[in-house]
Amino acid sequence: GDKTAGFLFYQTQDGFQFRSIDDMIEQESVATYVYTEVNKSSVDRNNDFRIIKYSVDKNQDLLKKLRLGTYSSQQLFFNPLNFRFTTPEQGKFKFQKSDVKKLGAREIELPKISDEAERTLDDLPTRIFTGILDVGTLDRGISRNVNADASKYQAQSTMRYNVLLTQTISMLIPCNTDLRAGNVITCEFPKISREDSSELDPDISGKYIIKELCHHFDPEGSYTSMKIVRDSFGFYGG
């Protein structure tokens, strides 16, 4: 459908995978990892699901997303059959919150373009996509139909992929060869405060998709390092 642009082609130890981002987000979490500096027992199985260390690599790089046209863009395509261009109204693309499934519970809120303005950053295009439509070029016969109309997916797939990379975390955990790139995991990080508290940090805790991972084995121990990503903040999305 028109609302499902954004597919990923990648390889894991199980072979090649081709999946939509929405399908990956709707997966059940395969494991829950907790960051704690307490190591209760060397034989406690809970230590297998402990985050040894982590670092937040990216946390909403707004300027980069504006440069890539993530939230709003203008498309300009040329039809070589009738020598017409798409109109400004036809080529306008705007980020729609309701069309996007997300890992976090918090809505993506964009700032206003100025303190006095009512419009937000998704109301003004920040990138222009240009191209030539494929009309009868790659068809075996004679056709006047547009083949793989880029105006229906190019801007949306760019939006979907870049929104997915809103928050990126690198972390190290005890070795787990059952994990795969593309799996969803739940991560729990304690909220930093002066007082003793078991409260979780809502800004970085929640569900993530494993973007990449590798396993390391040596006589001192076995570890899995990974990079995880998600598109929004909060514990649970939908």
Spell out what each predicted region is.
Residues 36-238:
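An acidic/polar, Gly/Ser/Thr-rich interaction patch typically located in mid-to-C-terminal regions
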Residues 1-64:
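Short beta-strand-centered interaction patches in the first periplasmic/extracellular domains
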